[in-house]
Amino acid sequence: MMNISAIENYVSQLELTDIEGNKIPIGNGNKIWLSIFREATCPFCNIRVYEMTQKAEYFLKSDIRIVAIFKSSSSDTKKFIAQQPRPFQIVADPDASIYRGLSLRSSFSAKLKAILLQMPRLLQGLSLTGTRGLVTSNQLPADILLDGKAKVLKIYTAKDISDHIPFSEVDRFI
């Protein structure tokens, strides 16, 4: 991943549009939690989206705009993530331009680690994605917390494909 100033420069120039066609302003005064997922078919990602959905009201009351980014087509993102209404904005990044722009890493060993050590969670996620969840990349997730001026307050890079920023760290962001 890039250094903080490079990330700030990159995200301040991002022109994000969610899967419903709504523009997502960055640096206009709202705190933003960019939760950068793998594919929409990722079993672990589907579980995390469910957890975020359960906690979203708390975060939204604190004036945090949550933006979930998926390295998937809009149709896959709608089918696997947005089949139920989500209380946050969802961005499809099918060509992985955001991932490349942030220099996020991939790791087969980190994927294998999650599969071996998080088997119950994997099986739970597969119940949501079906067999499509078995064919995913080695891309690792990341979370970036931005203040209202697009200044990076926290970067969390995943240790494996099931890993995301702990909710307790997002609490400190409030």
Give the residues covered by each predicted segment.
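N-terminal "domain-start" segment that seeds a small globular fold
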Residues: 1-27
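Short loop/turn microsegments at loop-to-beta-strand junctions
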Residues: 11-12, 31-33, 140-142
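Short active-site neighborhood of thiol/selenol oxidoreductases, capturing the structured segment around
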Residues: 25-52
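Short beta-strand/turn micro-motifs composed of small residues
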Residues: 37, 70, 147
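Structural microenvironment flanking redox-active thiols in thiol-disulfide oxidoreductases
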Residues: 48-101
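Thiol/selenol-based redox catalytic cores and closely related redox-interacting motifs
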Residues: 93-162
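A short, polar/charged loop-to-alpha-helix boundary motif
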Residues: 161-174
